[in-house]
Amino acid sequence: MTAVEGEPASVELADASRWYGNVVAVNDISFRLEGGVTGLLGPNGAGKSTILHMVAGFLAPSSGSVTVGGSPSWRHPEMYRRIGLVPEREAVYPFLTGREFAVAMARLHGMEPAAAAEAAARAIGLVELEDAADRAIGTYSKGMRQRAKVAAALVHDPPILLLDEPFNGMDPRQRLHMMELLRGMAAEGRTILFSSHILEEVERLAERVLVIVAGRLAASGDFREIRRLMTDRPHTFTLRSSDDRALASALLAEPMIAGAALDGGLLTVRATDFGAFSRAVSGIARRHAIRLHELLPTDESLESVFSYLVRR
């Protein structure tokens, strides 16, 4: 790929919302991107795909604005040449070979046949699909189809790349290569926005994170800040011991404990510091001659973390 000349292409949402009938998919979101890799992190159904499709010009915002390089992306064909989109859905033709698919996408961007063939070969090489380039896409694995979609998005060398759950179906080696490829393109000046519901993917790749929950922007910043918000939230644990009532009394004397309750033979504890509580609880039990039988965190799913970020 060639380095992007001039300033990085900007992507901006200003009070952007999108609804379908009575369903609000994106609710009054604002952010601005200029170069680098940004991760859209959120549970399935949070509105990440809708945001990407509005930036790509496939959907109009119901209110607010979505601009690319200062111009609206909706119904602006010139913008399409500046954007490469990797959708989550299976947007490939199984009867075409990988090479034919990439060439077709290049031709749709106005390239002459010779230039399209050259661009397709370059894009296929970038995603390491050369060995399967002349096989029908219908014979590809899920990870190979993902790479074919990425090649199609790169074929016209766009300054902006939008990827919706791009690592689905890829094996660990393919994921590592794709992350290195995206980092390299960002270093050349491109603006890259990708979605994921997997925390580790975003942590490894993104310089900036946008946390989306129920169509709202719950948090944004670098990953250290997002991690701090996630770690510092209250955590709920369930415990079973030889004497739950005595353990509850002992725990409530600790500054890290925000609350404790006994219900149906189960002790539920709220702690303000996950790590400190996990390290200290066994020692507290021993000091009071209590045998600890079970300790389980009950709210460690991403959905619970995201819900906390929305409520804070």
Task: Map each language-model feature to its residues.
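Conserved ABC transporter NBD signature motif
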Residues: 64-79
